[in-house]
Amino acid sequence: RGLAVNEIFTQANEKLCENNESGMFVTAWMGILDLATGKLQYANAGHNPPLLKRADGSFEYLKTRAGFVLGGMEGVRYRMGEITLTPGDRLFLYTDGVPEATNTENKLYGEDRLLTFMNQNTSVKAMELLPALKADIDKFVGEAPQFDDITMLIFDYKPQKGGSDMTTRKFPAKVDALSD
């Protein structure tokens, strides 16, 4: 078994801080999900908090400390959080381009509007929810130019018991390795 998520962030931070005279940094959220048990171990490096919807409830922000951005300062130690997902739970991750989308009146889409939208659409399938959210953001911003990316990921947890249907693939750290 490899490193824990917080250890990965600690090591990544040290590497990003090396020779970083320009002061560049990045936010990140990472989780490792055990598909059989639902155990999700995660760490947050200054990223937006994910939204979690339990199978029988509504979306809530995952209560977690944001942690410090990666590449911002040497010697930072990251904390690991852990939750257990149950069948039907849904997790939504997104970049800051979602809540920071700005309309022509210079108003932000915001975390509250995002939470409201998600809770008004709890029965919508995951594959349909992201395009609907993007359409809502586009309607909100209108013709206002945007300066940040919008990246979103959503999944519903469905337990996977071990066996032949389980696949583990390892890729080299090169984008072209993902071509197939």
Spans of model-derived segments:
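Conserved subregion of the PPM/PP2C metallophosphatase catalytic domain
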Residues: R1-A173, A177-S179
